[in-house]
UniProtKB/Swiss-Prot annotation:
One of its GO terms (biological process) is aminergic neurotransmitter loading into synaptic vesicle. PANTHER family: CHROMAFFIN GRANULE AMINE TRANSPORTER (PTHR23506:SF31), GH10249P (PTHR23506). The lineage of its organism: Eukaryota, Metazoa, Chordata, Craniata, Vertebrata. It comes from the Eukaryota. Gene3D superfamilies: MFS general substrate transporter like domains. Belongs to the major facilitator superfamily. Vesicular transporter family. Electrogenic antiporter that exchanges one cationic monoamine with two intravesicular protons across the membrane of secretory and synaptic vesicles. Uses the electrochemical proton gradient established by the V-type proton-pump ATPase to accumulate high concentrations of monoamines inside the vesicles prior to their release via exocytosis. Transports catecholamines and indolamines with higher affinity for serotonin. Regulates the transvesicular monoaminergic gradient that determines the quantal size. Disulfide bonds: none annotated. Keywords: Cytoplasmic vesicle, Glycoprotein, Membrane, Neurotransmitter transport, Synapse, Transmembrane, Transmembrane helix, Transport. This is Chromaffin granule amine transporter. Residues 1-21, 156-164, 216-224, 277-296, 358-362, 416-419, 468-521 are cytoplasmic. It catalyses: serotonin(in) + 2 H(+)(out) = serotonin(out) + 2 H(+)(in); (R)-noradrenaline(in) + 2 H(+)(out) = (R)-noradrenaline(out) + 2 H(+)(in); dopamine(in) + 2 H(+)(out) = dopamine(out) + 2 H(+)(in). The keyword NAD does not apply. The chain crosses the membrane at residues 22-42, 136-155, 165-185, 195-215, 225-247, 254-276, 297-316, 333-357, 363-383, 395-415, 420-440, 446-467.
Amino acid sequence: MLQVVLGAPQRLLKEGRQSRKLVLVVVFVALLLDNMLLTVVVPIVPTFLYATEFKDSNSSLHRGPSVSSQQALTSPAFSTIFSFFDNTTTTVEEHVPFRVTWTNGTIPPPVTEASSVPKNNCLQGIEFLEEENVRIGILFASKALMQLLVNPFVGPLTNRIGYHIPMFVGFMIMFLSTLMFAFSGTYALLFVARTLQGIGSSFSSVAGLGMLASVYTDNYERGRAMGIALGGLALGLLVGAPFGSVMYEFVGKSSPFLILAFLALLDGALQLCILWPSKVSPESAMGTSLLTLLKDPYILVAAGSICLANMGVAILEPTLPIWMMQTMCSPEWQLGLAFLPASVAYLIGTNLFGVLANKMGRWLCSLVGMVAVGISLLCVPLAHNIFGLIGPNAGLGFAIGMVDSSLMPIMGYLVDLRHTSVYGSVYAIADVAFCVGFAIGPSTGGVIVQVIGFPWLMVIIGTINIIYAPLCCFLQNPPAKEEKRAILSQECPTETQMYTFQKPTKAFPLGENSDDPSSGE
């Protein structure tokens, strides 16, 4: 009896390692934490840099004149005047010292300034905010740029050693990055933390999606699993920005990152129990080379759609909060909540079209999604307050959910159809496409905003998405591997023979046969 009780945890652990659902849970949690960390900094960084750099650099300018002006403001005659014009004394005294540096300190100027306090307060430091578009854009893009550089190495690495070790390496790097964000007080340290996040994200995303494609070999089941996993991504986007803005304003800068670090530890413990990351499990079949996959026009079309659709929200991350600070006088907590409709809609879109896209046609869902992305972006500059952003942002999130949940399974399907069924490299390409969008978007968006303004930036990226959308028609009926000779004449003979020869010998548990996972991890 005692032996049975003591052996129960080991038996449950063994069953867990054979469960496809628990593998899906591990990938879901990894994507959730990655994208929470991705978006939690969106409302924090602009206001944090504004508070630490702009206000500190201008404190000496305001400190001297404010002494003499404060003496004038505390006179009984002055307070009586402001009471006469229906302005509270407290509100006026907060803002007037900063304006007295440009006035004579007499009684009439405060009357004019009292009526324009909201406008002046909103536009204070406008030059600094415009310059911050570029710096913050580069900071946000650094994660995607590093991920872009690392992905080509992670894909082939997973083919050699399996998915488990890269997943755990990604967790450790993400944990270190989260701690750095919590205790970084300068732009340089934030940049290093963001770069580290890109490395960890590359390992987690490529290994996680490749693992799901290997476990769920049926096209319908794979689409559903990808939709659930992308739901973790969506939930991270959903929670990240509002969570970061609220915690930053009411608790402090470090608090959201410390909570994420604790959740990352739980994810690491889950990976240790389920994935057995000390075991090297290479693919028995040699995967198609990364260069060959990059020459496949159908994979390129799908990757381009992923890139451009996600570039829309990537451009909004650094530019929308600053635009709101300039035009809407938005407080800190609103900067994160502005992304809430997009995140909720993305969560709905990925889960809904993870199932529906297989029935409607994934190519059609991706086409409609890209058109909807373009239209939503065109509507963003029309908003005059945070409520006006609800519709465009919700449409944007839902449309990107359609695109991602449709095209991620297509990437695995194209490899099954036209190449060897080893998925590390193709999902490295998918992740590269995602990263290109998040690298080019923020880095160029800030520069474009400085030159032509935020509204025209939205027009440009929205129009590009609409123009690209018809290319998704080519994904309707891609030719199978037997037809590769007509598409890729140089690669066809070698790859077709390799696929035909290797398929019967494939023995990796997380591989092509749907019943194999029960004998694996």
